[in-house]
């Protein structure tokens, strides 16, 4: 679609994949949405096509998750359309000892949508694994 319609048209469709409904509907986040939409629209078409194709064509790594032996934190937004909770939970169960954190009111870009929650969860995780490395 990007090749034929261009970034401006496609970027409107991408926003609900990247961001949760809370972010997309919050009046106080209007400037943030505008900035992100502008960034999406300014992406080069060729690079975006290659990146999208890479995501679609990549091989799954689920079978390899069980070999991870390092402390692992999986973060998912409760409004994530790109990687829904059930996929994140599946990864969590596949990685022994991993921690799964759900960010309330966030989609796939939880670090932008709810940075305070993400930083809190990340800080707690890092505190627990202090000395591991």
PLM feature segments, named:
Residues 45, 85, 112-115:
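Conserved loop-to-helix N-cap of the C-terminal "lid" that shapes the substrate pocket in Rossmann-like
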Residues 14, 52, 91, 118, ...:
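Hydrophobic "lid"/C-terminal helical patch
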Residues 96-133:
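Catalytic active-site module of serine/aspartate enzymes centered on a nucleophile-bearing elbow/loop
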Residues 7-67:
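Conserved alpha/beta-hydrolase catalytic His-Asp/Glu region
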Residues 66-67, 92-94:
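Solvent-exposed polar/charged
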Residues 69-70, 97:
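Active-site acidic short loop of glycosyltransferases
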Residues 81-87:
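Conserved alpha/beta-hydrolase "acid-adjacent" motif
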Residues 68, 74-76, 80:
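Short beta-strand/loop motif that positions the catalytic acidic residue
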């Amino acid at each position: 679609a990007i090749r034929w319609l261009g970034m401006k048209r496609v970027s409107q469709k991408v926003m609900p994949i990247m961001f949760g409904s809370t972010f997309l509907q919050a009046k106080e986040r209007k400037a943030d949405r505008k900035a992100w939409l502008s960034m999406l629209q300014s992406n080069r078409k060729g690079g975006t096509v290659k990146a999208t194709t890479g995501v679609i064509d990549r091989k799954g790594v689920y079978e390899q998750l069980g070999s991870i032996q390092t402390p692992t934190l999986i973060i998912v937004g409760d409004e994530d359309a790109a990687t829904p909770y059930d996929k994140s939970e599946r990864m969590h169960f596949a990685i022994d000892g991993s921690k799964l954190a759900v960010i309330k009111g966030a989609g796939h870009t939880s670090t932008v949508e709810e940075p305070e929650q993400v930083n809190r969860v990340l800080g707690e995780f890092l505190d627990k694994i202090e000395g591991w490395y």
